[in-house]
């Protein structure tokens, strides 16, 4: 043949950045740019078209710029001046040292939403974790975080002609992301070897600079691993249960091994959702390796652990069959100094029940001193949900607390609103965002200025929709003339209502479409134009959620709804930012109490958007009359379908009789003064309470400070207190069953259960404590039963010790009930030690009458 086969050599051409622009490169490698809009705008202005093409990724932008373009920019005085201003701000920010008076924290989460450039998040949980890291950086606390670098991230969504969701997984090119490989002491890329039962999984470690703090990401997609283990970090929530377990071992055990390899030790370990619970397996192994027993080690681990639960339903927790769990975790009990059954029991509601699977959440509860839900109501729901773990106590007596989720103001507040706030608010605002006094200044802003800002944001959203969705709609909807008429129908002067969230069925996206005839009447009223914007993804395995999307798209194509109901595809952080700042009303209709917190409405709040929501999650606490609208928290029907119909009718009626008339009560200047009043009330009375600053401070004040204090108390002097408490617990366990009630003295009518209100009764018990010296507490528990058959605590009255003779302790209480009615009474004995953090820390209880 006259032509031989060509030999090709792969060549990577890296863009050579002129020395004058080096500072841009440095800024691009810290995700700080994502919430500092002078930086984002600077990158955008280098090449607006390319910036859009690169998905607003500054690393990719600088890589793709031609050498000529970069050379020209290096001589552009305006760009250089702006770059130097941003760089000075950036360096000043980084040079602040962390506050050493606050405990240091290691934070573990399966996902982080920092920017749509880094596809390592799927929804609210990830965005919350991302916001938390940004605020930790802004508040200058000593925190580091661990997660995964997913090869495919979470899917991007396209919709077929008939409205079927198509999930596309696109590989991320790690070389084009704002991340760096972590090097070991010898300057080699760090690899963490994580022991699974009889082999190791090898994880590369990457760092994301989130302002002042570091987020370490593990990645198994490398040639050191087999084809079975490379996919561990391919997809967020991807694969089967076996892959999920492998992910959770990597996050928990691999996460702690990563921090060890980097020489990082923190005061508090915060497990964000149960996925990271296995951090405590490795931490126990590490203590046992230093010569402590399991019982001593778990005292130290518990005292420095916080577990945050995000789901309100048992189905949301991960359960693993014993066989599968043993396949990968079988080697750990020996390192922890316990038996296999002991490890399994730490993850069971009913220790000893061989049929019960291992639950990560139960394991987290058993190995963390503190547990919290993510709103007041979710705290209550979690007390109920976990009450089976700590038998002997009622849900309302649980130590499970709550911190209501907030949002990172600099990320979610649009530049236009930030400018308005800075113009009118106190100059300390940035550092004191959760101070309600400062926000009251919104009342001094002229109504007209607020209306103008709102209209600017609406027009921006409408332009964005027209530009961004034209192409995808043309591809999917066939008839171009329909697209043009649809584009024309999007009206910035109409009341815009936004609904953006995961399409899980409990979020009830279908609610609005319960009565189509009534809905058609509302959206086609010429006096009160209104349009609905829907967006959201359904989990690839959630057929019902995908069905909902399909139904909404079908309805939106009917002639009477065309252009009035619009579905926007591929909901991500970029679209979310546009939507929560561009609509007038943010609609949220979950089935109560299934919305643990919900944060999109809080983001809307920061942008003068008014909430209209079911009283669930954060809105149950946030709602104020005259500052938004609410659907009652009461359930009228047990039957969900009937409840849905009632709630839908309520939504229609509030829209028709309150929201639309108020919005369109326009004055001569073209806006509604009544509407602006609601906007101002919402900003002044609600916004300061839902900043991420308030959330971070809550975590310190409610949990981190007391955990760190107790951990240092236990670990001082070679862990002396931890050893002492472990020995004391061991003694109580050994003697518990032999403790006996020697005598009991109470009036006959008390014994008969027939007592008078207001009358005082004296009750005396003599108990043989079997040498446990003051380690026994006794209390009288009175309960009442509600209509649903549930028993609740009415009162708990502690007995006093009035006499000691050797091991015989005489306990006495004076008891009276002021309210007449039907009650239940019992006596509860428990081990008592002032150095325990709460009762559920050592859950031994004996009831008697």
Give each language-model segment a name.
Residues 1-849:
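Catalytic cores of carbohydrate-active enzymes across secretory and cytosolic contexts
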């Amino acid at each position: 043949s006259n032509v031989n086969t060509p030999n090709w050599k792969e060549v990577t051409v890296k863009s050579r950045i002129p020395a004058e622009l080096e500072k841009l490169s440095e800024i691009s490698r810290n995700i700080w740019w994502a919430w500092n809009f002078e930086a984002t705008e600077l990158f955008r202005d280098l090449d607006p078209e390319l910036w859009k093409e690169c998905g607003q990724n500054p690393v990719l932008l600088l890589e793709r710029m031609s050498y000529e373009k970069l050379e020209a920019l290096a001589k552009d005085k305006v760009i250089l001046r702006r770059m130097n201003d941003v760089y000075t701000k950036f360096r000043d920010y980084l040079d602040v040292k962390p506050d050493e008076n606050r405990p240091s924290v290691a934070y573990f989460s399966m996902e982080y939403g920092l920017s749509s450039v880094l596809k390592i998040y799927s929804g609210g949980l990830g965005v919350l974790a991302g916001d938390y890291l940004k605020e930790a950086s802004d508040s200058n606390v000593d925190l580091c975080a661990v997660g995964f670098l997913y090869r495919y991230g979470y899917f991007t969504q396209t919709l077929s002609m008939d409205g079927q969701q198509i999930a596309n997984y696109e590989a991320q090119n790690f070389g084009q992301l704002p991340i760096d490989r972590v090097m070991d002491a010898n300057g080699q890329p760090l690899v963490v070897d994580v022991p699974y039962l009889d082999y190791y999984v090898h994880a590369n470690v990457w760092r994301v600079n989130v302002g002042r703090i570091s987020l370490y990401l593990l990645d198994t997609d490398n040639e050191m691993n087999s084809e079975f283990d490379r996919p561990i970090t391919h997809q967020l929530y991807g694969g089967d249960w076996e892959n999920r377990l492998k992910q959770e071992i990597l996050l928990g055990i691999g996460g702690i091994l990563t921090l060890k390899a980097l020489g990082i030790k923190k005061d508090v370990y915060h497990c964000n959702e149960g996925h990271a619970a296995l951090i405590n397996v490795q931490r126990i192994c590490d203590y046992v390796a230093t010569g402590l027993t399991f019982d001593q080690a778990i005292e130290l681990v518990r005292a420095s652990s916080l577990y945050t639960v995000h789901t309100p339903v048992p189905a949301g927790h991960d359960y693993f069959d014993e066989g599968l769990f043993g396949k990968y975790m079988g080697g750990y009990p020996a390192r922890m100094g316990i038996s296999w059954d002991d490890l399994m029991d730490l993850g069971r509601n009913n220790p000893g029940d061989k049929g019960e699977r291992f639950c990560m959440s139960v394991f987290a509860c058993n190995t963390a001193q503190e547990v919290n839900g993510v709103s007041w109501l979710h705290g209550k729901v979690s007390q109920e949900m976990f009450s089976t773990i700590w038998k002997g106590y009622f849900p309302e007596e649980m130590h499970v607390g709550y911190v209501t989720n907030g949002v990172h103001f600099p990320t979610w507040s649009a530049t236009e609103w930030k400018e308005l706030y800075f113009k009118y608010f106190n100059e300390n605002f940035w550092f004191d965002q959760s101070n309600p006094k400062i926000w009251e200044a919104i009342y001094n802003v002229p109504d007209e200025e607020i209306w103008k800002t709102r209209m600017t944001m609406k027009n921006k959203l409408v332009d964005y929709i027209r530009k961004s969705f034209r192409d995808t709609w043309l591809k999917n909807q066939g008839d171009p003339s329909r697209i043009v008429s649809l584009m024309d129908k999007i009206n910035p002067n109409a009341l815009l209502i936004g609904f953006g969230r995961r399409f899980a069925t409990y979020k009830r996206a279908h609610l609005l479409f319960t009565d189509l005839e009534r809905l058609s009447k509302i959206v086609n009223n010429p006096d009160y134009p209104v349009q609905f914007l829907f967006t959201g993804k359904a989990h690839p395995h959630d057929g019902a959620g995908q069905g909902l999307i399909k139904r909404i798209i079908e309805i939106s194509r009917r002639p009477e709804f065309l252009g009035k109901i619009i579905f926007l595809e591929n909901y991500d952080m970029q679209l979310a930012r546009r939507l929560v700042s561009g609509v007038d009303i943010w609609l949220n209709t979950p089935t109560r109490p299934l919305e643990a917190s919900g944060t999109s409405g809080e983001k809307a709040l920061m942008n003068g958007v008014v909430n209209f929501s079911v009283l669930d999650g954060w809105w149950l606490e946030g709602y104020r009359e005259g500052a938004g609208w609410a659907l009652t928290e009461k359930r009228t029907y047990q039957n969900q379908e009937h409840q849905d119909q009632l709630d839908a009718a309520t939504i229609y009626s509030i829209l028709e009789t309150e929201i639309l008339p108020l919005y369109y009560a326009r004055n001569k200047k073209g806006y509604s003064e009544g509407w602006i009043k609601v906007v101002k009330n919402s900003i002044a009375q609600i916004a300061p309470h839902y900043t991420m600053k308030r959330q971070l401070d809550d975590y310190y004040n409610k949990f981190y400070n007391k955990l760190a204090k107790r951990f240092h108390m236990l670990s001082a002097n070679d862990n002396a207190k931890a050893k002492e408490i472990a020995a004391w617990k061991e003694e109580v366990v050994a003697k518990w069953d032999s403790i006996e009630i020697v005598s009991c003295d109470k009036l006959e009518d008390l014994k008969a259960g027939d007592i008078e209100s207001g009358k005082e009764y004296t009750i005396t018990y003599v108990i043989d404590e079997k040498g446990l010296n003051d380690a026994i507490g006794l209390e009288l528990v009175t309960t009442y039963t509600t209509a649903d058959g549930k028993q609740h605590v009415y009162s708990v009255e502690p007995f006093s010790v009035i006499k000691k003779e050797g091991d015989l302790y005489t306990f006495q209480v004076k008891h009276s009930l002021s309210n007449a009615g039907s009650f239940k009474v019992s006596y509860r004995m428990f081990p008592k030690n002032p150095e325990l953090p709460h009762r559920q820390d050592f859950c031994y209880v004996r009831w008697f009458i």
